[in-house]
Regions:
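Polybasic, lysine-enriched low-complexity intrinsically disordered terminal tails
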Residues: 1-11, 214-232
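Hydrophobic alpha-helical segments that form the core
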Residues: 4, 117, 122, 166-186, ...
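An amphipathic alpha-helix adjacent to DNA-recognition modules
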Residues: 21-29, 41-42, 53, 62-86, ...
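Hydrophobic alpha-helical connector segments
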Residues: 72, 86-117, 169-176, 220-224
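Amphipathic alpha-helical packing segments from all-alpha helical-bundle domains
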Residues: 82, 97-100, 133-159, 171-174, ...
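Amphipathic alpha-helical segments used for helix-helix packing
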Residues: 98, 113-134
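Amphipathic C-terminal alpha-helical segment
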Residues: 109-112, 156, 176-194, 206-216
Length: 232
């Protein structure tokens, strides 16, 4: 499976960005924020020019078309997601611990409203699920890569004897993925601030029912470590 890690977490050699590159990144930061709340279809050269108080011709120098702008915005959203969600989970050991870390960093990213409109990819998925074309294809590729990443860690947990042999790791990943998506929906639409705690409880319940004694020890040690970290 090609998971989210295939899109890279390593840092390139740091160099000072050119003025044009810096401007390009600043434009995309605003574009991502607009698209998260108003949708990628609501994002246009004109809408962005209005927000940035720039000329349309100036923006056309960076993006030749609306589709090009949308694809660049998706790539910026992917980069932010990697920084906010994927990279913080990577120091955790493969398997159950990393799966937990990935889910917690994802919940935290939604809860903290890193994007003005909530989870960028949840919104983009709902917007483009039935629309053919390059933008829809890229949304599907990126969201599937994240789900594949969760599936891979669940499979790794089973290989490490942390999950029961009868556990379906693909189903488990599907379930925990759905819990976070539901928390995002309940918070954004219903303003339900308890949705994240419910999602955490649901994830714990599913994991505890699927783990082996070895996996339960891993969960217990991790829970104790997190409590100590919070108390400091």
């Amino acid at each position: 499976m090609e998971n989210i890690l295939a899109f890279g977490t390593s840092r390139a050699v740091v160099r000072r960005p050119t003025r044009g590159e810096q401007t390009h990144q600043e434009i995309l930061q605003v574009a991502v924020d607009i698209a998260s709340a108003e949708g990628l279809e609501g994002l246009s050269i004109g809408r962005l020019a209005q927000e940035l108080k720039m000329s349309k011709s100036g923006l056309f120098a960076h993006f030749g078309s609306k589709e090009e702008l949308q694809l660049a915005t998706l790539d910026m959203a992917r980069s932010i997601f990697m920084t906010e969600v994927v990279e913080p989970a990577m120091p955790s050991e493969k398997g159950l611990l990393r799966l937990q870390a990935m889910l917690e960093s994802w919940l935290s990213y939604v809860e903290r409203s890193v994007f003005r409109g909530g989870c960028f990819f949840a919104a983009a998925s709902a917007e483009f699920d039935d629309r053919p074309g390059p933008v829809s294809d890229q949304v599907a590729t990126l969201t599937k890569a994240w789900l594949d990443g969760l599936e891979d860690e669940a499979c790794q947990a089973q290989a490490l004897s942390q999950l029961k042999a009868k556990c379906d790791p693909i189903l488990l990943a599907f379930q925990v993925h759905a819990f976070v998506q539901e928390a995002n929906w309940a918070y954004r639409l219903l303003r339900d601030k308890q949705s994240f705690n419910r999602a955490r409880a649901a994830i714990c319940q599913v994991l505890e029912s699927a783990v082996t004694p070895k996996g339960l020890r891993v969960l217990s040690v991790n829970a104790t470590a997190r409590k100590k970290a919070k108390s400091k």
